[in-house]
């Protein structure tokens, strides 16, 4: 029998503990995988984002312990992963709008400035 600890704080100002974080994150990763389909299968961003998202979703589906999930993904607390996934959903739109895969000169990629404002 495993014991799951419930943390009281993330220790990050403004970022509250999410009691349903695993469920929320799995949903966001599934949304992201679906949304990535708007990009061409050959687009570099789509390929790398799909690989990372599938890996992370696999961790979440196969592990129930939040600490183990955080350690395996190794990209912050699960609440931070939720923020990252929400931002990734926005980035897909930016990549799609800019049509970054159609660059005339692949040695001079455009600079995409992302702001949460």
UniProtKB/Swiss-Prot annotation:
GO terms for biological process: respiratory electron transport chain. InterPro entries: NDUFA5. Its main location: mitochondrion. It is a peripheral membrane protein. It is found in: Mitochondrion inner membrane. Transmembrane segments: none annotated. Pfam families: ETC_C1_NDUFA5. GO terms for cellular component: mitochondrial inner membrane; respiratory chain complex I. It comes from the Eukaryota. Keywords: Electron transport, Membrane, Mitochondrion, Mitochondrion inner membrane, Respiratory chain, Transport. Accessory subunit of the mitochondrial membrane respiratory chain NADH dehydrogenase (Complex I), that is believed not to be involved in catalysis. Complex I functions in the transfer of electrons from NADH to the respiratory chain. The immediate electron acceptor for the enzyme is believed to be ubiquinone. Complex I is composed of about 45 different subunits. Belongs to the complex I NDUFA5 subunit family. This is Probable NADH dehydrogenase [ubiquinone] 1 alpha subcomplex subunit 5. It comes from Dictyostelium discoideum. The gene is ndufa5.
């Amino acid at each position: 029998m495993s014991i799951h600890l419930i943390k009281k704080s993330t220790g990050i100002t403004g970022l509250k503990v999410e009691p349903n974080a695993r469920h929320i994150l799995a949903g966001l990763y599934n949304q992201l995988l679906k949304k990535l389909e708007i990009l061409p299968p050959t687009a570099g961003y789509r390929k790398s984002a799909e690989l990372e998202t599938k890996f992370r979703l696999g961790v979440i589906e196969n592990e129930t312990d939040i600490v183990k999930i955080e350690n395996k993904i190794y990209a912050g607390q699960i609440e931070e992963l939720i923020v990252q996934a929400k931002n990734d959903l926005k980035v897909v739109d930016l990549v799609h709008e800019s049509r970054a895969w159609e660059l005339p000169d692949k040695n001079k990629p455009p600079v995409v400035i992302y702001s949460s404002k």
